[in-house]
Amino acid sequence: WASQVSENRPVCKAIIQGKQFEGLVDTGADVSIIALNQWPKNWPKQKAVTGLVGIGTASEVYQSTEILHCLGPDNQESTVQPMITSIPLNLWGRDLLQQWGAEITMPAPSYSPTSQKIMTKMGYIPGKGLGKNEDGIKIPVEAKINQEREGIGNPC
């Protein structure tokens, strides 16, 4: 999963205990939060012992009583014990994002936006190497001029 920063919010889907949820990727949130109106009624929850800061005033704050199995947007295995409160959309916090291997990368300014789009369409993920297992060279190979005119491509 990759998302360019744009006017659209970065949202992705996760499957928690077999149920699909969509949430906002929030690197500023320590913990993941599920909207109270999306929390299944038969899933146990308890009053949270700590409040939530940064989302306004939430009168009812709960936490899952269980640690739940979660599959990330690219089927990354993870676990979460989310907070639950009245918010308009779910938030995927760093508790999940770290397990999913999320990265924030800023492309090298030497590459044009067009070349970055071409690479992204070809399946390149910033910060990952090229190749089947994304384990290839992670930085571009720089072309160097061979002043001695020796080596492949130069007459002896």
UniProtKB/Swiss-Prot annotation:
Keyword set includes Hydrolase: yes
Enzyme class: hydrolase
Domain Peptidase A2: 21-96
Known EC number: 3.4.23.50
CDD domains tied to this protein: HIV_retropepsin_like
One Pfam family from the record: G-patch
Record GO biological process: proteolysis; viral translational frameshifting
Domain of life, source organism: Eukaryota
Record GO terms (molecular function): aspartic-type endopeptidase activity; nucleic acid binding
PROSITE patterns noted in UniProt: ASP_PROT_RETROV, ASP_PROTEASE, G_PATCH
Active site: 26
Keyword annotations of the record: Aspartyl protease, Autocatalytic cleavage, ERV, Hydrolase, Protease, Transposable element
G-patch domain boundaries: 111-156
SMART domains associated with the record: G_patch (SM00443)
Catalyses which reaction(s): Processing at the authentic HIV-1 PR recognition site and release of the mature p17 matrix and the p24 capsid protein, as a result of the cleavage of the -SQNY-|-PIVQ- cleavage site
More details: Two human-specific proviruses are inserted as tandem repeats with a shared LTR in most individuals tested. The telomeric copy is referred here as 'provirus 41574'. The centromeric copy is referred here as 'provirus 41575'.
Subunit note: Active as a homodimer.
Similarity field: Belongs to the peptidase A2 family. HERV class-II K(HML-2) subfamily.
Official protein name in the record: Endogenous retrovirus group K member 6 Pro protein
Species name: Homo sapiens (Human)
Gene: ERVK-6
